């Protein structure tokens, strides 16, 4: 399993998530409060070096009808710049409603999403990464079931 980092890119914060060595469980790592691009990249570089990250998984906020809206294009642009600065490939996954799901998780834990926006971003990043891990796992299982000798 390659080491990946899940990112929920926002205007004010970046939620960051990682996964276990088996690539089965995603967890929130931290929230980066954005100041400027150089500072954001420096913080991400430190995390990537510590974890031996080989790929970035970024949530794209498609519109509810599945289109790439202006927000998704902004996220894509920023993700490409970050990937280039870190010399890492970027892969995208649909992140529709992950922030809503993250807020619901916090409410279940009796924490206010309004007062814990940093946790919302971390949980959203973990949901994004978990979605990617699950999709990858399903693809691997389907390939094994088909008897593909490549896997």
Swiss-Prot record:
It is an enzyme of class 3 (hydrolase). It is found in: Cytoplasm. GO terms for molecular function: nuclease activity. Keywords: Cytoplasm, Hydrolase, Nuclease, Ribosome biogenesis. Its main location: cytoplasm. GO terms for biological process: rRNA 5'-end processing. Its EC number is 3.1.-.-. GO terms for cellular component: cytosol. PANTHER family: POLYNUCLEOTIDYL TRANSFERASE, RIBONUCLEASE H-LIKE SUPERFAMILY PROTEIN. Could be a nuclease involved in processing of the 5'-end of pre-16S rRNA. Belongs to the YqgF nuclease family. This is Putative pre-16S rRNA nuclease.
């Amino acid at each position: 399993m390659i080491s990946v980092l899940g990112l929920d890119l926002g205007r004010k914060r970046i939620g960051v998530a990682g996964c276990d060595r088996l690539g089965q469980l995603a967890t929130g790592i931290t929230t980066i409060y954005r100041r400027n691009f150089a500072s954001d990249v420096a913080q991400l570089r430190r995390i990537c070096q510590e974890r031996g990250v080989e790929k970035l998984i970024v949530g794209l906020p498609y519109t509810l009808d599945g289109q790439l809206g202006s927000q998704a294009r902004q996220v894509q642009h920023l993700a490409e710049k970050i990937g280039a600065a870190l010399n890492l490939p970027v892969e995208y996954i649909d992140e529709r409603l992950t922030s809503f799901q993250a807020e619901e998780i916090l409410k279940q834990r009796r924490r206010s999403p309004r007062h814990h926006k940093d946790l919302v971003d971390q949980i959203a990043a973990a949901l994004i990464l978990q979605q990617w891990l699950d999709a990858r796992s399903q693809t691997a299982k389907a390939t094994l079931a088909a008897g593909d000798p490549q896997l």
